[in-house]
Amino acid sequence: MNRFLSHVTNRIDAKGRVSVPSVFRAVLLEAGVRELYCFQDFVFPAISVGGPELLDRFEKQMAAEDPFSDAANEMSLLVHGGGVYVKLDPEGRLMVTDFIRDFTGISNDVTFVGRGDHFQLWDPQAFARAQAEAREGRKQRGLRSQ
């Protein structure tokens, strides 16, 4: 169980916390991840979440670029300027901060979406629309969606 798979919707509690699904917490535990790196996704209205290796991957891409290039500067603005570290509380919950809410439109519920080596936080309706659009896009290109 070393991949983030499926999707789960959980309600935000009165204190602004949401429980990370147990299957996702198990992947984090297996990987020894204690601190989560979160950033505003480059394409979708979602927050991408993973361990330190997620940030490392982007920093390796930036290191391969000329540090003064537009590509490196744009990546840094997105990865560093659009990123934060968060920790889960002892019960496996995370705070749904303004950083998360403002970018995603999340209000009462969070859909956790597995993306293989990381997961994302979505507004449930936005995720349903994006998934439907992805299926339709694959259909239009003659690709199977299932």
From Swiss-Prot:
Which coarse location class describes where this protein primarily resides?
Answer: cytoplasm
Keywords assigned by UniProt?
Cytoplasm, DNA-binding, Repeat, Transcription, Transcription regulation
What PANTHER family has UniProt attached to this entry?
TRANSCRIPTIONAL REGULATOR MRAZ
Q: Supply the NCBIfam families for this chain.
A: PRK00326.2-4
Its Gene Ontology molecular function terms?
Answer: DNA-binding transcription factor activity; transcription cis-regulatory region binding
Single GO BP term = negative regulation of DNA-templated transcription initiation
Query: What organism is the protein native to?
Result: Rhizobium meliloti (strain 1021) (Ensifer meliloti)
Q: Which residues form the SpoVT-AbrB domain?
A: 7-54, 83-126
Q: Where in the cell is it found?
A: Cytoplasm, Nucleoid
Q: Which family does it belong to?
A: Belongs to the MraZ family.
Q: Which Gene3D superfamilies match?
A: Transcriptional regulator MraZ domain (3.40.1550.20)
Instruction: Name the chain's protein.
Output: Transcriptional regulator MraZ
Instruction: Look up the domain of life of the source.
Output: Bacteria
Q: Name one Pfam family in it.
A: MraZ
Coiled-coil region? none
GO CC terms for this protein?
Answer: cytoplasm; nucleoid
Q: How does it assemble?
A: Forms oligomers.
